[in-house]
Amino acid sequence: VSDVRNVIIIGSGPAGYTAALYTARASLKPLVFEGAVTAGGALMNTTEVENFPGFQEGIMGPELMDNMRGQAERFGAELVPDDVVAVDLTGEIKTVTDTAGTVHRAKAVIVTTGSQHRKLGLPNEDALSGRGVSWCATCDGFFFKDQDIAVIGGGDTAMEEATFLSRFAKSVTIVHRRDTLRASKAMQERAFADPKIKFVWDSEVAAVKGDPKLEGLTLRNLKTGETSELPVTGLFIAIGHDPRTELFKGQLELDDEGYLKVEAPSTRTNLTGVFGAGDVVDHTYRQAITAAGTGCSAALDAERFLAALADGEATEPEQTQTANV
């Protein structure tokens, strides 16, 4: 069992790294569990990030995360590419257990575990993962050169995946359960203008077929109930995300969808000394810049909490104006 630290950050990505940067600059010496597989968060799986302010020409997702990570490290954050397997956040001193079984203790914890890709929940889906079924076009798109591919979803991610895949694929079919897209106007127009992309509306995937590799999909029209076959060798699923909050069930208050509840506008959770930021909290905006913003807020909230503790106040201080920018 280690000494008691000021703050432990569980998770990385823009929220975790920004929280690490701010707490490190406040000389709190944060320990950051970046995640073994998920270090860097969802942006590690994106290509060009064109909407993060300050990068006129855009920046690659992994490069942006690498920059943020290095910046946090430069100011003294301790970054560990490891997962957390258990937590006890209920006491005054919080405990966090890593995969090696080492128990780390801290006065404050910031949760930035992010979210993961939602699955269709069909038999065969997991079995064919990596054999035609994927959740990441930028990771796997290259393997589908000159093949027929389906993309499931109607939001920005689905359009982004489809337009990216059209560079490699012979054809891309977007299957959406409604007859209009949720994606932004710019993303829609890009997809509609692409000669390789076609749409199947009002439909869902009823079955994922193939053994040992993906051979096709059975689609069900939600208005008529009719089924049809779509022969594809690639399936990219882009139907949203589920927050990574499994670890915190029974301790931290979650909403109906499993997202961490915080006392807005602060990042405080229902447990004293525990704060939440990034996609694990946010199912509205889900942008790199908003995640970074809440990571900053969580760090400032934790900083104030620790200052109040040092002054002998047992509870969290009231909201105060801050001059930090």
Per-segment meaning from a language model:
Residues 1-10, 26, 31-32, 38, ...:
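FAD-binding core/adjacent interface of flavoenzyme oxidoreductases
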Residues 3-75, 147-148, 153, 159-185, ...:
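Beta1-alpha1 glycine-rich phosphate/pyrophosphate-binding loop at the start
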Residues 13-15, 115-117, 156-157, 282:
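Residue-level detector of alpha-helix initiation sites
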Residues 20-21, 44-45, 121-124, 162-164, ...:
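Short amphipathic alpha-helical segments
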Residues 40-41, 119-120, 159-160, 182, ...:
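Glycine/Thr-rich phosphate-binding loops of Rossmann-like dinucleotide-binding domains
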Residues 69-98, 103-106, 166-264, 304-325:
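A Rossmann-like FAD-binding core segment of flavoenzymes
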Residues 159-161, 271, 280-325:
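A conserved FAD-binding loop/helix module that cradles the flavin
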